[in-house]
Amino acid sequence: MDSISSDNTTIISKNKIHNFDLIINSAGLHADYLANKSNLKTRYTSLPFKGKYWKISFGDKNEIPNRLIYPVPNLDQPFLGVHTVYDKDGNFYLGPSSTPVFGREAYRPFRKFNFLEFCALSYKFILKIIFNENNLRNLAISEFKNLFLSSVMKSSNVYFKHKPVKIELSSKVGIRSQMFDKNSKKLFNDFVVIKQNNIIHILNAISPAWTSSFAMAEFICEKYTIKK
């Protein structure tokens, strides 16, 4: 998308013009980018975090924990911490980490690399880490350790009764579209829904489970789209 008209009724994209009566911006990692294209001014800025997972293998299936295990969360941060996860095939994982990343789609190094985005996000992250806003410096240091096998092995001793026979970095990667509140200088831990004329912006929808939630869809429709 190149731009939105000043009256918020027309989208210009790749030399094509699209007229609309209502648009819902729920673009996840790109939601703030689209909001900026519509000239929406907010106190929020995007700080993406990458989540990586470690695949855990045990010598016997009976040694695999039969329930999800979560750490006690840090209430100063909107993250659940590294916890256990299963996939549909029964594989067992530990994760995700929450590492600051300098690109909305930086799932792999230097793929879909955007230099301007890299510079902008690097600048924002570096300043916040230097001044330790919302303990981001401490978070970055602690999460950086989770990129190394030795640290994950140490953590696994707390989670499991039996020692894993193999721990390997999984190809599963996710990027969290986290919003930072410039006024409170904290990572925001709730949805941000803003109605701008006939555009509804849904920011900080950090999880696919949230964006696919019927309850969330019902809330948006009832409060922002249905005329009473």
Language model segments and positions:
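Short alpha-helical "patches" and their helix-cap loops
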Residues: 1-4, 226-228
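Flavin-dependent oxidoreductases
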Residues: 3-114
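A sequence-composition feature that detects small, non-aromatic residues
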Residues: 6, 27, 31, 35, ...
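Short, intrinsically disordered/low-complexity patches at protein termini
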Residues: 42-44, 117-118, 224-226
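FAD cofactor-binding and catalytic pocket of flavoenzymes
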Residues: 64-127, 144-167, 177-190
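C-terminal catalytic lobe of FAD-dependent flavoproteins
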Residues: 125-228
